[in-house]
């Protein structure tokens, strides 16, 4: 929802040469009222006063320029024109906000998640791992076939799958150990830095104490 200050600015037609502000300037000029002085007073009343207080406040401002028989009608005209312009502007603002939200939702719906780009280095590393798995499994298969050809044929699929899973698990475990090692090393470094700061602090304090004692001894000698 648009803020009150934004609505008021739109009602006045700031920046576009139109709106209530231009109409009020023309009306005040026709009534012989100094718009440069009283425009701000009138707008302040319209923007800040309660609805039932607007007429009384406007009559107090314009009574010095207008006859009593026309004063109330002109004040009503100003209040009604303000209300009409404000209502239209508020409606347009709401429609603009709804359109903006609709457009945003449509754009979000059109967003397509881009697939992760696999680098050439990753491709080569993956191919090397697959080739390594293939070589090891082929050697194991040959040994199994020599020992028990029937059992080898029956279990070949599960053995390969198990080997792959085991190797993947080994890789993951190795990475975890590496992360843990780095974290432990970082913690040790922090503790060492903390101890070093404490040592530096104590050494500084000791130097101050020694300097203080030397100063005191010098004063006693004098």
UniProtKB/Swiss-Prot annotation:
Residues 136-145 have a biased composition (Acidic residues). Residues 172-209 have a biased composition (Basic and acidic residues). Residues 152-168 have a biased composition (Polar residues). Residues 210-222 have a biased composition (Basic residues). There is a cross-link at residue 93 (Glycyl lysine isopeptide (Lys-Gly) (interchain with G-Cter in SUMO1)). Keywords: Coiled coil, Isopeptide bond, Phosphoprotein, Ubl conjugation. Residues 119-148, 175-217 form a coiled coil. Residues 135-222 are annotated as: Disordered. The modification Phosphothreonine is found at residue 137. Belongs to the CCDC43 family. This is Coiled-coil domain-containing protein 43. It comes from Rattus norvegicus. The lineage of its organism: Eukaryota, Metazoa, Chordata, Craniata, Vertebrata.
